[in-house]
Regions:
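Hydrophobic alpha-helical membrane-insertion segments
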Residues: 11-22, 77-101
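Transmembrane helix-loop junctions in multipass membrane proteins, especially transporters and channels
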Residues: 28, 32-36, 67-71, 94-106, ...
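Cytoplasmic juxtamembrane regions at transmembrane-helix boundaries
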Residues: 69-89, 147-154
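Canonical alpha-helical transmembrane segments
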Residues: 47-74
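Cytosolic juxtamembrane helix at the C-terminal end of the final transmembrane segment
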Residues: 3-4, 67-70, 131-154
Length: 154
């Protein structure tokens, strides 16, 4: 196996930062609605749709352009590195969010790409920790769909 364990984490963090910037500075404006009483709010349905579109874009770009040449085994180990990082830093930011607010915001920027899963889980009424576990674990393994099958060597 090539030393490719870092590819999924680096790609996903870079894509997350880009997604976060796009949501905050450009695309988030699409979700703003004026309510009948004149107040301004964010439409959660539009936000979930926006997050889903960005997620699909990240998955397709990563799968077709960055991970297509990797085997499923390589993608699995690389994705597992990201999952471990998500779990450790996710719990750390949860426990220290009042103390290390700037780190919490930084980690949010670097883990934004899979946020659609936690948004859907909240929409379905799942508990906070279950939705966090889904968002931390499931998205990186979607790249397995784009990997090559392992060719056994004799």
């Amino acid at each position: 196996m090539k030393k490719s364990w870092w590819k999924v984490p680096v790609y996903c963090m870079a894509a997350s930062w880009v997604c976060f910037q796009m949501e905050v500075h450009f695309l988030g404006k699409w979700t703003i609605v004026t309510l009948p009483d004149g107040s301004i709010s964010s439409d959660n349905t539009r936000w979930v749709i926006l997050s889903a579109v960005l997620f699909l874009a990240v998955v397709c770009i990563g799968g077709f352009f960055f991970f297509r040449s990797m085997t499923r085994k390589e993608i699995f180990f690389s994705s597992s590195a990201l999952v471990a990082l998500n779990i450790v830093l996710g719990i750390f930011t949860y426990l220290t969010q009042r103390t290390f607010t700037s780190f919490t915001m930084f980690w949010i920027e670097l883990s934004e790409w899979g946020s659609v899963f936690s948004q859907i889980a909240f929409y379905l009424g799942l508990n906070e920790w279950l939705s966090a576990a889904i968002a931390w674990v499931l998205p990186p393994y979607i790249f397995l769909l784009f990997g090559k099958k392992d060719i056994p060597t004799d």
